[in-house]
Protein backbone atom coordinates (compact mmCIF):
# COMPACT_ATOMS: atom_id res chain seq x y z
CA UNK A 1 0.00 0.00 0.00
CA UNK A 2 2.70 2.42 -1.06
CA UNK A 3 0.14 5.15 -1.67
CA UNK A 4 -0.22 5.51 2.11
CA UNK A 5 3.20 6.74 3.28
CA UNK A 6 3.51 7.02 7.02
CA UNK A 7 4.17 10.76 6.81
CA UNK A 8 1.09 11.60 4.71
CA UNK A 9 -1.16 14.04 6.51
CA UNK A 10 -3.50 15.19 3.73
CA UNK A 11 -7.25 14.93 4.25
CA UNK A 12 -10.51 16.01 2.77
CA UNK A 13 -12.40 18.80 4.46
CA UNK A 14 -15.48 17.91 6.51
CA UNK A 15 -18.63 17.77 4.44
CA UNK A 16 -19.82 21.35 4.23
CA UNK A 17 -23.34 22.60 4.72
CA UNK A 18 -25.84 20.04 3.51
CA UNK A 19 -23.27 17.99 1.59
CA UNK A 20 -23.38 14.28 2.28
CA UNK A 21 -20.31 12.76 3.95
CA UNK A 22 -18.39 10.43 1.66
CA UNK A 23 -17.12 6.94 2.40
CA UNK A 24 -14.66 4.38 1.18
CA UNK A 25 -15.71 0.74 1.39
CA UNK A 26 -12.85 -1.73 1.88
CA UNK A 27 -13.12 -5.51 1.53
CA UNK A 28 -11.01 -8.41 0.29
CA UNK A 29 -13.21 -9.23 -2.70
CA UNK A 30 -14.83 -12.35 -1.29
CA UNK A 31 -18.58 -12.31 -2.09
CA UNK A 32 -19.67 -12.58 1.55
CA UNK A 33 -17.36 -9.77 2.66
CA UNK A 34 -18.38 -7.59 -0.26
CA UNK A 35 -22.08 -8.11 0.46
CA UNK A 36 -21.67 -7.11 4.09
CA UNK A 37 -19.56 -4.06 3.30
CA UNK A 38 -21.89 -2.77 0.58
CA UNK A 39 -24.96 -3.55 2.66
CA UNK A 40 -23.78 -1.33 5.51
CA UNK A 41 -22.63 1.39 3.11
CA UNK A 42 -25.98 1.45 1.32
CA UNK A 43 -27.81 1.57 4.65
CA UNK A 44 -26.06 4.82 5.60
CA UNK A 45 -27.56 6.61 2.60
CA UNK A 46 -24.18 8.28 1.99
CA UNK A 47 -22.23 8.26 -1.29
CA UNK A 48 -19.36 5.80 -1.26
CA UNK A 49 -16.58 4.37 -3.39
CA UNK A 50 -15.96 0.63 -3.32
CA UNK A 51 -12.27 -0.25 -3.03
CA UNK A 52 -11.58 -3.99 -3.24
CA UNK A 53 -8.24 -4.96 -1.73
CA UNK A 54 -5.67 -7.51 -2.77
CA UNK A 55 -3.60 -9.13 -0.02
CA UNK A 56 -0.26 -10.44 -1.23
CA UNK A 57 1.50 -13.56 0.03
CA UNK A 58 2.96 -14.24 2.53
CA UNK A 59 0.72 -11.77 4.40
CA UNK A 60 -2.40 -13.48 3.00
CA UNK A 61 -1.48 -16.57 5.03
CA UNK A 62 -1.13 -14.69 8.34
CA UNK A 63 -3.55 -12.89 10.66
CA UNK A 64 -3.10 -9.11 10.22
CA UNK A 65 -1.78 -8.58 13.74
CA UNK A 66 1.30 -10.60 12.70
CA UNK A 67 1.99 -8.65 9.51
CA UNK A 68 5.45 -7.12 9.22
CA UNK A 69 5.84 -4.13 6.88
CA UNK A 70 2.05 -3.99 6.32
CA UNK A 71 2.36 -1.14 3.82
CA UNK A 72 3.56 -3.76 1.31
CA UNK A 73 0.88 -6.33 2.16
CA UNK A 74 -2.12 -4.82 0.42
CA UNK A 75 -2.94 -3.11 -2.83
CA UNK A 76 -6.09 -1.25 -3.72
CA UNK A 77 -5.85 -2.64 -7.23
CA UNK A 78 -7.17 -0.08 -9.69
CA UNK A 79 -8.48 2.11 -6.86
CA UNK A 80 -6.23 4.73 -5.32
CA UNK A 81 -5.77 4.58 -1.58
CA UNK A 82 -4.33 8.06 -1.39
CA UNK A 83 -5.65 11.53 -0.53
CA UNK A 84 -8.05 13.24 -0.47
CA UNK A 85 -9.25 11.07 2.39
CA UNK A 86 -12.92 10.18 2.90
CA UNK A 87 -15.09 11.31 5.79
CA UNK A 88 -15.41 7.70 6.91
CA UNK A 89 -14.26 4.20 6.01
CA UNK A 90 -16.25 0.98 6.19
CA UNK A 91 -13.90 -2.00 6.44
CA UNK A 92 -15.10 -5.60 6.38
CA UNK A 93 -13.01 -8.45 7.74
CA UNK A 94 -9.61 -8.54 9.37
CA UNK A 95 -7.72 -8.08 6.09
CA UNK A 96 -9.36 -4.68 5.64
CA UNK A 97 -8.64 -3.52 9.19
CA UNK A 98 -4.94 -2.71 8.64
CA UNK A 99 -5.49 -0.42 5.61
CA UNK A 100 -8.41 1.24 7.42
CA UNK A 101 -6.18 2.05 10.38
CA UNK A 102 -3.46 3.36 8.07
CA UNK A 103 -5.99 5.62 6.32
CA UNK A 104 -7.02 7.01 9.69
CA UNK A 105 -3.40 7.70 10.56
CA UNK A 106 -2.63 9.27 7.18
CA UNK A 107 -5.69 11.53 7.47
CA UNK A 108 -4.39 12.94 10.71
CA UNK A 109 -7.03 11.01 12.62
CA UNK A 110 -9.89 12.77 10.85
CA UNK A 111 -11.40 9.80 9.00
CA UNK A 112 -13.93 7.89 11.07
CA UNK A 113 -13.59 4.09 11.01
CA UNK A 114 -16.37 1.50 11.03
CA UNK A 115 -15.31 -2.14 11.11
CA UNK A 116 -17.55 -5.09 10.21
CA UNK A 117 -16.61 -8.23 12.18
CA UNK A 118 -14.21 -8.38 15.09
CA UNK A 119 -10.79 -7.12 13.95
CA UNK A 120 -9.26 -8.99 16.92
CA UNK A 121 -6.66 -6.30 17.46
CA UNK A 122 -6.54 -2.54 18.20
CA UNK A 123 -10.31 -2.51 18.73
CA UNK A 124 -10.19 0.80 20.61
CA UNK A 125 -9.02 2.58 17.44
CA UNK A 126 -12.30 1.91 15.61
CA UNK A 127 -15.21 4.29 16.12
CA UNK A 128 -17.78 1.56 15.50
CA UNK A 129 -17.51 -2.23 15.27
CA UNK A 130 -20.50 -4.08 13.80
CA UNK A 131 -20.24 -7.67 15.00
CA UNK A 132 -22.64 -10.64 14.90
CA UNK A 133 -23.97 -11.96 18.18
CA UNK A 134 -22.14 -15.27 17.87
CA UNK A 135 -18.78 -13.42 17.92
CA UNK A 136 -19.50 -12.60 21.59
CA UNK A 137 -17.89 -9.18 21.22
CA UNK A 138 -19.31 -6.49 23.47
CA UNK A 139 -18.30 -2.93 24.29
CA UNK A 140 -19.38 0.72 24.13
CA UNK A 141 -18.42 0.99 20.45
CA UNK A 142 -19.81 -2.41 19.42
CA UNK A 143 -23.16 -2.76 17.64
CA UNK A 144 -24.35 -6.37 17.88
CA UNK A 145 -26.33 -7.91 15.03
CA UNK A 146 -28.15 -11.23 14.90
CA UNK A 147 -26.24 -12.45 11.84
CA UNK A 148 -24.31 -10.79 9.05
CA UNK A 149 -25.27 -7.38 7.67
CA UNK A 150 -26.34 -7.63 4.03
CA UNK A 151 -27.91 -5.96 0.98
CA UNK A 152 -31.38 -7.54 1.16
CA UNK A 153 -34.15 -4.92 1.33
CA UNK A 154 -37.81 -5.05 0.39
CA UNK A 155 -37.19 -2.54 -2.39
CA UNK A 156 -34.31 -4.53 -3.86
CA UNK A 157 -36.28 -7.79 -3.76
CA UNK A 158 -39.22 -6.19 -5.55
CA UNK A 159 -36.99 -4.58 -8.18
CA UNK A 160 -35.20 -7.86 -8.86
CA UNK A 161 -38.48 -9.76 -9.00
CA UNK A 162 -39.58 -7.41 -11.79
CA UNK A 163 -36.22 -7.60 -13.57
CA UNK A 164 -36.40 -11.40 -13.76
CA UNK A 165 -40.16 -11.52 -14.29
CA UNK A 166 -40.00 -14.66 -16.48
CA UNK A 167 -39.07 -16.72 -13.41
CA UNK A 168 -42.40 -15.87 -11.78
CA UNK A 169 -44.16 -18.20 -14.25
CA UNK A 170 -42.39 -21.27 -12.83
CA UNK A 171 -44.58 -23.90 -11.12
CA UNK A 172 -45.08 -23.43 -7.40
CA UNK A 173 -43.75 -24.04 -4.85
CA UNK A 174 -40.45 -22.47 -5.83
CA UNK A 175 -37.60 -23.94 -3.79
CA UNK A 176 -34.39 -21.91 -3.74
CA UNK A 177 -31.10 -23.64 -2.92
CA UNK A 178 -28.04 -21.57 -2.01
CA UNK A 179 -24.98 -23.79 -2.12
CA UNK A 180 -21.67 -22.74 -0.59
CA UNK A 181 -18.60 -24.87 -0.16
CA UNK A 182 -15.71 -25.88 2.04
CA UNK A 183 -14.21 -23.32 4.40
CA UNK A 184 -12.10 -23.38 7.56
CA UNK A 185 -14.95 -24.90 9.54
CA UNK A 186 -16.91 -27.11 7.13
CA UNK A 187 -16.31 -29.68 4.40
CA UNK A 188 -18.54 -30.02 1.35
CA UNK A 189 -17.59 -33.20 -0.46
CA UNK A 190 -18.90 -34.42 -3.79
CA UNK A 191 -20.62 -37.22 -1.88
CA UNK A 192 -22.48 -34.71 0.29
CA UNK A 193 -23.38 -32.65 -2.78
CA UNK A 194 -24.80 -35.79 -4.37
CA UNK A 195 -26.88 -36.44 -1.24
CA UNK A 196 -28.21 -32.87 -1.33
CA UNK A 197 -29.02 -33.17 -5.03
CA UNK A 198 -30.83 -36.47 -4.49
CA UNK A 199 -32.86 -34.99 -1.63
CA UNK A 200 -33.88 -32.03 -3.80
CA UNK A 201 -34.75 -34.35 -6.68
CA UNK A 202 -36.89 -36.46 -4.38
CA UNK A 203 -38.69 -33.38 -3.07
CA UNK A 204 -39.47 -32.09 -6.56
CA UNK A 205 -40.52 -35.50 -7.83
CA UNK A 206 -42.93 -36.05 -4.96
CA UNK A 207 -44.39 -32.57 -4.55
CA UNK A 208 -43.77 -30.84 -7.88
CA UNK A 209 -42.76 -27.21 -8.08
CA UNK A 210 -39.52 -25.66 -9.30
CA UNK A 211 -35.91 -25.29 -8.23
CA UNK A 212 -33.81 -22.14 -8.42
CA UNK A 213 -30.25 -22.98 -7.44
CA UNK A 214 -27.12 -20.88 -7.23
CA UNK A 215 -23.72 -22.34 -6.40
CA UNK A 216 -20.84 -20.25 -5.10
CA UNK A 217 -17.22 -20.09 -6.15
CA UNK A 218 -16.43 -22.45 -3.27
CA UNK A 219 -18.78 -25.09 -4.70
CA UNK A 220 -16.21 -25.65 -7.43
CA UNK A 221 -16.55 -26.69 -11.05
CA UNK A 222 -16.92 -30.40 -10.29
CA UNK A 223 -19.58 -29.72 -7.68
CA UNK A 224 -21.54 -27.44 -9.98
CA UNK A 225 -21.34 -29.99 -12.79
CA UNK A 226 -22.71 -32.67 -10.45
CA UNK A 227 -25.64 -30.46 -9.44
CA UNK A 228 -26.46 -29.71 -13.06
CA UNK A 229 -26.32 -33.37 -14.03
CA UNK A 230 -28.70 -34.45 -11.26
CA UNK A 231 -31.07 -31.49 -11.15
CA UNK A 232 -31.00 -29.91 -14.61
CA UNK A 233 -34.09 -31.79 -15.77
CA UNK A 234 -36.46 -30.19 -13.27
CA UNK A 235 -38.35 -26.92 -13.84
CA UNK A 236 -36.32 -23.92 -12.77
CA UNK A 237 -32.79 -22.65 -13.27
CA UNK A 238 -29.26 -23.26 -12.06
CA UNK A 239 -27.23 -20.09 -12.41
CA UNK A 240 -23.95 -20.65 -14.26
CA UNK A 241 -22.26 -17.42 -13.19
CA UNK A 242 -22.74 -15.68 -16.53
CA UNK A 243 -24.94 -12.69 -17.27
CA UNK A 244 -26.90 -10.78 -14.67
CA UNK A 245 -26.89 -12.34 -11.21
CA UNK A 246 -30.43 -13.49 -10.29
CA UNK A 247 -29.59 -14.01 -6.60
CA UNK A 248 -31.98 -11.40 -5.19
CA UNK A 249 -34.71 -12.44 -7.63
CA UNK A 250 -34.37 -16.00 -6.37
CA UNK A 251 -34.86 -14.78 -2.80
CA UNK A 252 -37.84 -12.67 -3.84
CA UNK A 253 -39.59 -15.56 -5.61
CA UNK A 254 -38.83 -18.31 -3.11
CA UNK A 255 -41.49 -20.18 -1.18
CA UNK A 256 -38.73 -21.82 0.85
CA UNK A 257 -34.96 -21.35 0.94
CA UNK A 258 -32.34 -24.04 1.55
CA UNK A 259 -28.83 -22.93 2.49
CA UNK A 260 -25.69 -24.92 3.25
CA UNK A 261 -24.49 -24.55 6.83
CA UNK A 262 -21.12 -23.00 5.93
CA UNK A 263 -22.39 -19.51 5.10
CA UNK A 264 -23.51 -17.06 7.79
CA UNK A 265 -23.93 -14.44 5.07
CA UNK A 266 -26.31 -16.46 2.88
CA UNK A 267 -28.36 -17.65 5.87
CA UNK A 268 -28.64 -14.05 7.10
CA UNK A 269 -29.73 -12.89 3.64
CA UNK A 270 -32.32 -15.67 3.43
CA UNK A 271 -33.60 -14.74 6.89
CA UNK A 272 -34.17 -11.16 5.73
CA UNK A 273 -37.02 -12.39 3.52
CA UNK A 274 -39.18 -13.69 6.37
CA UNK A 275 -39.59 -16.99 4.49
CA UNK A 276 -38.88 -20.52 5.73
CA UNK A 277 -35.13 -21.13 5.80
CA UNK A 278 -33.76 -24.67 5.91
CA UNK A 279 -30.13 -25.41 6.73
CA UNK A 280 -28.36 -28.17 4.80
CA UNK A 281 -25.97 -29.70 7.31
CA UNK A 282 -22.35 -30.36 6.39
CA UNK A 283 -19.50 -32.22 8.04
CA UNK A 284 -17.42 -30.10 10.39
CA UNK A 285 -18.35 -26.91 12.17
CA UNK A 286 -16.96 -25.10 15.19
CA UNK A 287 -18.20 -23.41 18.35
CA UNK A 288 -18.85 -20.07 16.67
CA UNK A 289 -20.94 -21.60 13.88
CA UNK A 290 -22.80 -23.75 16.41
CA UNK A 291 -23.73 -20.64 18.39
CA UNK A 292 -25.01 -18.98 15.23
CA UNK A 293 -27.10 -21.96 14.14
CA UNK A 294 -28.51 -22.48 17.64
CA UNK A 295 -29.50 -18.81 17.82
CA UNK A 296 -31.25 -18.92 14.44
CA UNK A 297 -33.16 -22.08 15.36
CA UNK A 298 -34.18 -20.63 18.73
CA UNK A 299 -35.48 -17.49 16.99
CA UNK A 300 -37.74 -19.66 14.81
CA UNK A 301 -35.94 -18.64 11.62
CA UNK A 302 -34.20 -21.82 10.51
CA UNK A 303 -34.84 -25.54 10.68
CA UNK A 304 -32.72 -28.47 9.54
CA UNK A 305 -33.77 -29.85 6.16
CA UNK A 306 -35.20 -33.36 6.48
CA UNK A 307 -36.63 -33.76 3.00
CA UNK A 308 -39.93 -31.94 3.45
CA UNK A 309 -41.03 -28.32 3.00
CA UNK A 310 -43.28 -26.64 5.53
CA UNK A 311 -44.54 -23.09 5.93
CA UNK A 312 -43.76 -20.79 8.84
CA UNK A 313 -42.95 -17.15 9.45
CA UNK A 314 -41.02 -15.00 11.90
CA UNK A 315 -40.45 -11.29 12.54
CA UNK A 316 -37.77 -9.74 10.33
CA UNK A 317 -35.16 -7.85 12.35
CA UNK A 318 -33.42 -5.32 10.12
CA UNK A 319 -30.07 -5.03 11.83
CA UNK A 320 -28.45 -3.67 8.68
CA UNK A 321 -30.74 -0.63 8.65
CA UNK A 322 -30.10 -0.12 12.36
CA UNK A 323 -26.34 -0.32 11.88
CA UNK A 324 -26.49 2.04 8.91
CA UNK A 325 -28.54 4.59 10.83
CA UNK A 326 -26.18 4.37 13.79
CA UNK A 327 -23.12 4.90 11.62
CA UNK A 328 -24.71 7.76 9.71
CA UNK A 329 -25.66 9.53 12.94
CA UNK A 330 -22.14 9.03 14.28
CA UNK A 331 -20.58 10.51 11.15
CA UNK A 332 -22.96 13.48 10.98
CA UNK A 333 -22.47 14.23 14.67
CA UNK A 334 -18.72 14.17 14.27
CA UNK A 335 -18.81 16.45 11.25
CA UNK A 336 -21.33 18.76 12.92
CA UNK A 337 -18.87 19.32 15.75
CA UNK A 338 -16.13 20.16 13.28
CA UNK A 339 -14.09 17.14 14.35
CA UNK A 340 -13.61 13.58 13.21
CA UNK A 341 -11.36 12.03 15.77
Model-derived regions, located:
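A nucleotide-sugar donor-handling region in carbohydrate enzymes
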Residues: 123-189, 305-313, 317, 321
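Catalytic binding pocket for nucleotide-activated donors in carbohydrate/polymer assembly enzymes
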Residues: 265-314
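Donor nucleotide-activated moiety binding/catalytic core segment of transferases
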Residues: 227-265
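Short internal beta-strands
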Residues: 51-52, 130-131, 211-217, 281
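Active-site and donor-binding regions of nucleotide-sugar-utilizing enzymes
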Residues: 25-144, 150
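Conserved catalytic-core segment of nucleotide-activated headgroup transferases in glycan assembly
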Residues: 182-215
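Leloir-type glycosyltransferase catalytic cores
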Residues: 294-341
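Short, structured helix-loop element that forms part of the nucleotide-activated donor/catalytic region
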Residues: 217-231
Amino acid sequence: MASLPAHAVCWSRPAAGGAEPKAWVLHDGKPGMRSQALGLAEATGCPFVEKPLRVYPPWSMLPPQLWLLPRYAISGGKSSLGPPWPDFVIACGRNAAIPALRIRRASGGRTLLAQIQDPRFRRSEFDLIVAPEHDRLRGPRVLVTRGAVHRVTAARLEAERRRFRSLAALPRPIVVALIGGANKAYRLTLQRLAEIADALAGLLTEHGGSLLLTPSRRTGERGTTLLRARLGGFPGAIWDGSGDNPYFAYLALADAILVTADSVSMISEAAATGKPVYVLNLDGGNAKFERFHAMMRAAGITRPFTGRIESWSYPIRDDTARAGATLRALVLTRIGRGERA
